[in-house]
Each structure stands twice: as C-alpha cells, then as structure tokens.
Amino acid sequence: MFFVKKDIQKLLSVMIPILVAQVSTAGVTFINTTMAGHAGADDLAGVSVGAGLFYPLLASIIGLLMAGTPLMAQLIGRKERESLPFIVRSGMVIGLSVWVLFTAAYIFFIDHLMAALALESAVEYIARYYLMTMIGVVFFIALMIPLRCLTDTAGSTSISMKLFLMAPVVNGIFNYLFIYGHGGMPALGGIGAGLATMITYGFLLVLFVLVVLKSKELEGRTIFTSLSLRTQDIREYLVVGVPSGLSIFMEMSLFSLIIVFLARYGTDALAAYQIADNFASLVYMLPVSCSMALTILIATAVGANDMALARRYKKAGFVVAMAGAMITASFTVIFRSSIGSVYTDDAAVALIAGQFLIYSAGWQLFDAISTPIQGILRGLKDTRISFILMVLAYWGGCFPMSLFLDTHTTLGADSFWLGLDFGVACSALLMVFRLLYVERKLDGRPVPTFAGILALLSGRKTAPAAVSVYTISLHRNVKKAEELLALWTEMEEKLSIIMQKIKESEVDIYEEMGRILPIRMSLLTDLHLSIIGHATRAYIP
C-alpha cells in the first residue's frame, strides 16, 4: 500500500501543474468569448465562427508537437540528456512546417471558405481577420510547445504551470485595450480578441525561451547555438506525433459534425448541446492531465528499463482517473439543473441541457479508462494503432450508432448523446485490449494473433502457432524433434556466450539487450520442454 500511495503522490505532483496549465489555457478562450460578447453580437458571432474553425486545427497541431514529451522522457530515463536539443529542434522544424502550410491554406482558401459559410458581411469581416491573427498564434505555438515538452520532462511541470497562469491575465489586459479601444488603441472588437491572443502566446514563447536559456539542466544554450538536426529524430517525432494529432482532429471533427445533425431539432437543442459539451470539455481536462502526466512518468521509466515502475504508475493512473471520474460524474448528475442555469437564463434550454448532462456523465466514466491508456501508450511510443482504434470507435461505432438511433427510434436529439456514449465506451474497450497486447509483447509473453482468435472461435483446442509443436510432442516424431532439439542446443550455447560477454562489458548499449536475451532463452526452454513431451501452457492452451 505504501508503494501505491507513493506512486499516486508522484503522479499527482506531475499532474496537478498540468491541470492548472490546461485550465489557464481554457481561460484564454473563455475571456475572448466573454469580452467579445460585450463588444456586440456581430463580434461574438465572428469570434465564435473563427474559433470553431481554428481550434480543432490548433488542438491537432498541439497533439502533433506534444510527441516530444515521450521522446524526451525516454532519453532522460536512458540518461542521454545530450540528445534533448536534437528533439527540441526537430519539434520546432516540424511546427514551423505546419505554420507554413496553415499560412498558405489561409491565403489560398479563405475567400472560398467565407463564401461557403455565407455569413453576414459584418460577421464575415470579423471571422476573416480573426483567423488572420491565428497565423501568428500558430507560429508562436510551433516554437513554444517543443520547449514546453522540454521543461515538463527535463525540468518540472510546475514551470509550464507558472508561465501559463500568466496567460489569462495578459490576454485580459490586451483584450481590454484592443477590443474596446482603451489606452489609445483602436477599438477592433472581435478582431482585437484574436490580436490579444497572438500577443499572449508570443509573450509565453519569450518566457519559455528565457527559462530554458537560464537553466543548465535544460541544455538551453545548446539548443539555440546549433542548428544541426538528425533525420531519425524528425522521423520518430512524426511517427509518434502524426497519429496523435490526427486522432484529436478526427474526434473534434465528429463533435462538430453532430452539431449539423442536431440543427433540425431547433435552437434550444443546439444551445443545450453547447452547454453540455462545454461543461464536459472542462471536466475532460482532468483525465487529459492524468494522461499527460502518465506519458512523462511511464516514458521515463521505460527509458530506464524499469518496467515494474511503469506498471505501478499505470495502476496509480487508473486509481486517480477513476476516482476523479466518480466524483465529477456524481457532481454532474446531482447538480445538472444548476449547471444548466449557470450557462443560461432560458428555463427550456437549461432543462434540455440537464438531460444531456446525464449522458455526459457516462463520457466521464469511460474517458477515465480510455484517456489514461492513451497517455500510457504514448509513453511507450505506441500511437499508430491507437489512432486506428480511435477512428474505428468514433467513426465506425459512434457515428453509425447515432444515425441509426436518430432514424429508427423516437429518441430525438438524445440519439446522438447515446451514440457518443457508445463511441466512448468502444474506445475504452479497444484501448484496454491494445494495452494488454502491448504489455504482453513487452514482457515476451505470447500475444494473441488474428489466426489464433479465429481458431478459438471455430472450436479448435489449439492455436495454429502451437499445432506443430503439439503434434511433435503427441506423436513423438523423433527425427523432427531431434532436429529442433539440436537447433535449440546450438542457439542456447550461442546465447550463453553472448550473455557472458554482456555481463563483462560496461557499454551502455547492451543494457536493453541484456533484458531481451533472457526472455528469448526462456522461450527456447519452453520449446525444448514441448519437444520432449512436457508441453507448457504458453504453447498448449
């Protein structure tokens, strides 16, 4: 119990600063929306349209660049801190490349996009130039996120917490100046909110650069005094980051698409959806922060080849996430009417929102399973399959189920919430299976194969991979057994020689091999036992 408590304390020490930073970032969006709303309805509408178009892309870009976290954490675990600057520079190069693409997309497609939206002229003007200011936001974030990955892993998550706490204050000050035209500045309305956001992130970038430069532990001067890159670092960054970024984009795209289908149920249903979705997004910061903390801790443990510690952090993560979900879900259900009233004075909208909030409580419970697992898998640099499973869960499960319930039942707008619950549940189930698969593979244990599953479903008592050994053991095919036994003996002798050399060597590169080779020898021993007639459960279910 002491170890569990200690691991939970360690997780919380990393997670809480991340949570505070997440809330501070959300505060910037809240301040923009609130202050733009006081400038006028057109300003609020323009900012809402611009933010609705931009923030799914921004979240995807951040998801891509946050891939630096597991890469750097594993380097720290392996005590290879001298390689950290290469990862930071790789992230910056990738981020700047994304910024160039975003800028080009704005230049060439903004007119077509505005025409397709068919907005009122005043709203279109604000949305167009609000999105222009977001070009600057992407530029600053492209350079800032790799530095945040560095401070979170090589330093402390409290660094980014302290810096992000300044964001709402700085943003509020510049909103006051540029939205309303105080201090001799022009009154730009909603466009001023975008300009204030750009200045805020530029300010944060400067702070991160100063912190990194002043810290010897963060290899700050090495980062900025050299421009050298390594192709393998960029490739690995993309391999881990692209699936993460795409998964965020696909998930947010689905939620945006559901709004389109809800439109036919009226303004009240749409407003209620926005209320429930906004509150659920705020609560979602808890499992997301837990997930980000798990990525750092598990990647560091894996880099140090301490899988036992990684498993303890995994258990601590589930305890924290589930405890948090039980509290927030209970709060959501019990106080759903009050929550709706905070967002609106319209009793009808608040009533519908309260009903939707019950469904969002289901999200919270399933997210407490799937989201931490995503962080664990990121720590293991396993993101590609997770992305595929997420797409299957949401676009192959959630969306079809929502449409089916909408067209074949009388549930109305509730159909889409039930579909979302179904999708999140599918995501949680698939993530559990993926984690179990990856863990068995890392442990050197036999992993289930598609052919083996088919054999099991068809009623066969043995998996295809075990049939040949089982047949040899059962029928005593002496010649074949002797050939395999000779091969086993030869390989065992070679492995013993290699193991002896590894023990005598002090070269760090052999540390991981030293863990893998005994596993392989254990598997060979099982094969030997199977051949001579003592089949093990690993081969004969």
Model-derived regions, located:
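Long, low-complexity or tandemly repetitive, helically biased scaffold regions used
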Residues: 470-476, 480, 503-541
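Interfacial/gating helices of multi-pass transporter permease domains
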Residues: 36-55, 87, 122-126, 190-191, ...
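Short runs within selected transmembrane alpha-helices of multi-pass transporters and secretion channels
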Residues: 65, 134-152, 160-171, 193-208, ...
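Transmembrane helical elements of multi-pass membrane transporters/channels
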Residues: 13-29, 133, 167, 200-204, ...
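Helix-terminus/linker motif at the lipid-water interface of multi-pass membrane proteins
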Residues: 23, 27-45, 114-121, 177-188, ...
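Signature of the first transmembrane helix
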Residues: 9-69, 73, 242-262
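Short alpha-helical transmembrane segments in multi-pass integral membrane proteins
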Residues: 1-18, 72-139, 185-242, 298-363, ...
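Small-residue-rich hydrophobic transmembrane alpha-helices
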Residues: 44-104, 141-160, 259, 270-336, ...
